[in-house]
């Protein structure tokens, strides 16, 4: 709109003809110069007001959704149009000046000088306005760039502050955990649980408050605060749960033990009172008697009989249905007799006699062997009568031991002292048989 107004003002002088100029000169002669001057200034002020209004309307009607690049292009186009219109006006005014100099009188020349001054003022005003607009647009762009750089700096500083606050909160959490662990070791479990829970909650609140304050500075929506697990508290809670479970299991076991004892007492009472009477009592009470209950009652009666006769009871780890209590009692009696019966003095087996009379061909070896075997009397072993078979075996043993000693000595001399090859299986070993 502003460009169209400038073009109208520029094209207006083209329409003016020389006849019109002459009429103006005549009117100027008749009318005083002051009145004409005021009239011309009023028309100029009205045209300026119209231009301003049109500019304002154009600005209002522009869509806000246009991009910055489009606005820059428009400002450049407007400035180029203004320059063209100003050049066109300069050319027209120069042509008008030439005509007016040829055709005008002295009064006309004065008037044209005034017009030229006014036109030059208008041109200077339009140029200064375009410069001001350019300057304003540049200053706006600079301000925008400065504000963007400030926002970036602020965002960077905020991110640094967040990182610092997070690291501080982590360090505090670690300190809190270490303190809670050291306290929970020395204090009672029940007291430490309640105190550590209240303290941990208070510390969490204290930690969360500075976080919220630091994060509220940022325009972005703040995420929920991180609530990490307190390992010390978790361990204490797990320990408490385990203790509760152990208590429950212990109570169940105690109940089961009590029930078993009651059943055993009932079985013992049934055994003493007689199985037939017990079954009769159960039938009289109205309970259903199964064959298993009847068998258990019979076995209990047998065990009671055996206990009364022998004084030996069948242990609980045996199945009462599979073990006969009377036979078990007899076996136990025999075992006890064998264990606690004293040894008879004349009973010695042949193998015992052979070991006692063993001779290695060396007294020291014989003494060592008897000590190891627990043989006490040497004189009795020598004086006792020996059978022919035992004597032969003793002789054979002596010969075997002598041969072994000779072979060992030969092998030792060849391997260690003479340094023979291997174990000494050479022609010198043939002399071993003669020894």
From Swiss-Prot:
**Coiled-coil zones:** 230-270
Which location does the Swiss-Prot or TrEMBL entry give for the cross-link Glycyl lysine isopeptide (Lys-Gly) (interchain with G-Cter in SUMO2)?
376
Q: Where, by residue number, does the polypeptide cross the bilayer?
A: none
List of residues that carry Phosphoserine: 4, 17, 30, 32, 104, 377
Keyword Phosphoprotein in the entry? The reply is yes
For this UniProt record, the keywords arranged alphabetically read as follows: Acetylation, Coiled coil, Isopeptide bond, Phosphoprotein, Ubl conjugation
Kindly list the positions at which N-acetylalanine occurs in this protein. Answer: 2
Give the Basic and acidic residues compositional bias ranges.
Answer: 1-27, 66-111
- Region described as Disordered: 1-230
Bias regions of kind Basic residues — which residues? Answer: 35-51, 112-214
Describe the family membership recorded for this protein in Swiss-Prot or TrEMBL: Belongs to the RSRC2 family.
The protein's name is: Arginine/serine-rich coiled-coil protein 2
Report the source organism: Pongo abelii
């Amino acid at each position: 709109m502003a460009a169209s107004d400038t073009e109208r003002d520029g094209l207006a002088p083209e329409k003016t003809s020389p006849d019109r100029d002459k009429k103006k000169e005549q009117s100027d002669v008749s009318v005083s110069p002051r009145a004409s001057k005021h009239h011309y200034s009023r028309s100029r002020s009205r045209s300026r007001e119209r231009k301003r209004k049109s500019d304002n309307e154009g600005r209002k009607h522009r869509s806000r959704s246009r991009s910055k690049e489009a606005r820059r292009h428009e400002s450049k186009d407007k400035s180029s149009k203004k320059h063209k219109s100003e050049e066109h006006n300069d050319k027209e005014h120069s042509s008008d000046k030439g005509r007016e100099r040829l055709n005008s009188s002295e009064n006309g020349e004065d008037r044209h000088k005034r017009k030229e001054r006014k036109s030059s003022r208008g041109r200077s005003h339009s140029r200064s306005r375009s410069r001001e607009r350019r300057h304003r647009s540049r200053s706006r762009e600079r301000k925008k760039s400065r504000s963007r750089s400030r926002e970036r700096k602020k965002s960077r500083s905020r991110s640094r502050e967040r990182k610092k606050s997070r690291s501080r909160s982590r360090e505090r959490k670690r300190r809190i955990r270490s303190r809670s662990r050291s306290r929970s070791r020395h204090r009672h479990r029940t007291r430490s649980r309640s105190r550590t829970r209240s303290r941990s909650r208070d510390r969490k609140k204290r930690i969360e408050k500075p976080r919220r304050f630091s994060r509220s500075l940022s325009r972005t929506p703040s995420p929920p605060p991180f609530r990490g697990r307190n390992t010390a508290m978790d361990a204490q809670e797990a320990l408490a749960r385990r203790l509760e479970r152990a208590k429950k299991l212990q109570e169940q076991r105690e109940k089961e033990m009590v029930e078993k004892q009651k059943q055993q007492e009932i079985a013992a009472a049934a055994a003493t009172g007689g199985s037939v009477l017990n079954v009769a009592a159960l039938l009289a009470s109205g309970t259903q008697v199964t064959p298993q209950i009847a068998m258990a009652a019979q076995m209990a009666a047998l065990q009671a009989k055996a206990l009364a006769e022998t004084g030996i009871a069948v242990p609980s780890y045996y199945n009462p249905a599979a073990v006969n209590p009377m036979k078990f009692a007899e076996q136990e009696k025999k075992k006890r007799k064998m264990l606690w019966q004293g040894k008879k003095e004349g009973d010695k087996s042949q193998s015992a006699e052979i070991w006692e009379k063993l001779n290695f061909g060396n007294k020291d070896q014989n003494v060592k062997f008897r000590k190891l075997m627990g043989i006490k009397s040497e004189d009795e072993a020598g004086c006792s009568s020996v059978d022919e078979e035992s004597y032969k075996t003793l002789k054979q043993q002596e010969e075997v031991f002598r041969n072994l000693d000779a072979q060992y000595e030969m092998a030792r001399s060849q391997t260690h002292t003479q340094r023979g090859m291997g174990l000494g299986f050479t022609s010198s070993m043939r002399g071993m048989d003669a020894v």
